[in-house]
Structure formats: structure tokens, C-alpha cells
């Protein structure tokens, strides 16, 4: 069984240089997830909406209400005076993890942020790769869907000494994957791994309070445990529609726009559909 956990919010953005309209981005990224899930038999999609606008919630509901495998938890409003955008997002992370901690141990969980635009068959490939690697790699396997630029050594990057580390590369049936010490907040692992390392995952809730906390010393500490191997594809399964610097290597502007256009919904308006690349 695959559980996809998607956190949505149209009220604030962590990226000021976002390349697309945030509301439109969420709907198109959701559509790409729904298209991916069509071919997966045993699945659920649980959406945690963090106090989005009334209009957006109605749009969200209209897109998924006919799908029996989708549930939505609409979080109520709360006092967030003086909180940074990053800190505001921690509450929905907490709710998501509480949900995951109650799932069956052996089920797969794909936690995904609302600005990941998926290529066709991306999620099926993640599941297939997890199953394949689990047969001959004697570790708990994780899949990070993004071919994240900063995890490659590059002369234009300012933080090579932080992000770039040695790895090993394994071929799957579709492409090569490399081990990674780091992920952002979108990844797929078994539910039991969340429970085994609950203390490490819960440290993610401190981001926004403690300036020293980031993905690299919270959730990524799990990927560096002796019983865990996290993999990322060499050739991205998603496009992170945030800043243009996040567009993966060898993914062209034409490919991004084609994927973006392919996932428009009946709510899409021309003025909200521009991609700034």
C-alpha cells in the first residue's frame, strides 16, 4: 500500500522568487500526482490543507471529490502573528507526521510538498525502484524524487563543501540512482522508519525557531543511519517549481513548460499560467 501525504497552503510561500503563481502551482502539481496515481492499484492520497483561502479550498475539493482514495484534512485557522513562513509551515508537518505514525509499519509513505510537478509515471517508478533495490540492498531504502542540483559538484555553487559528498551509483530498470546524504522534505520511505527515528523526524518541527536547524541536520540525519540508504535519480522524476535555480540539470525550459501545460486544470486561467524562466 502506498500512502501519499500532500501538504497544501496558498497563503504563504517560502520562495520570493517563485517562477509560477503559487495557487496555480499547487493545482497543477496536484494534478500531476493524481495522473501518476491512476496506474497504482493500492494507494491513498491524504491532503493536509493548512488554512488556505476559501476559494482555493473549493477548487481543491472540486478536483478530488470524485476520487474515493483521496481524503482532505482542512486545518483550522490559528494565531500565527510574528511567525516566519517557515515556522508557519511546521504545524502542518506535525499533523502529517502524526498521521504517518499511525499507518501500518510496512506501508510505503510518500511525503511531498505542493510545488513538485511530477513527470508521467514518476511515482510508479519510485515504487518499482524501492521494491527492486529492497531485494538486494540490505538497508532500509528511501527515494528522493528530485535530481537535486546542489548535490552535484559544480563550480557555480557556493556550498559545494556542504552538499557534495561521496556516493555510490546503482542502476535500476529505468535509470541510474545515486545515494544521497541529504533530501528536502519530499521523499518516500516505509512508515516504520518514521516510527523508528521519530525523534529525528520531529526535530524538523524546530525549523523556524532554532536558526541552526535545517533539513541537513534533522531528517537527513536519518539517511545517514547505518541501516538506511536514501537514493535520488540521475535524471529527475520531478521539477521543483520554486526558484529557477532548482530546475534540474538537463531539463530544458521547453520540457518544464510542456509538463506545466500538460497539467493545467479546468480552473487554470491564462493570467495565472505563466512560467518565468
Where do the protein language model's features map onto the residues?
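Acidic ATP/Mg2+-coordinating residue in the GHKL
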Residues: 49-50
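Short beta-strand-to-loop acidic/aromatic patch adjacent to the donor-nucleotide binding site
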Residues: 106-117
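Short, flexible/disordered intra-domain loops and linkers
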Residues: 12-24, 81-87, 202-210
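C-terminal catalytic/acceptor-binding lobe
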Residues: 180, 189-277
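Active-site-proximal specificity loops/subdomain of glycosyltransferases
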Residues: 53-106
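Conserved catalytic core of nucleotide-sugar-dependent glycosyltransferases
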Residues: 119-202
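N-proximal low-complexity "stem/linker" segments adjacent to membrane-targeting elements
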Residues: 1-35
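Short loop->beta transition adjacent to catalytic acidic/histidine clusters or analogous donor-positioning motifs
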Residues: 2, 36-46
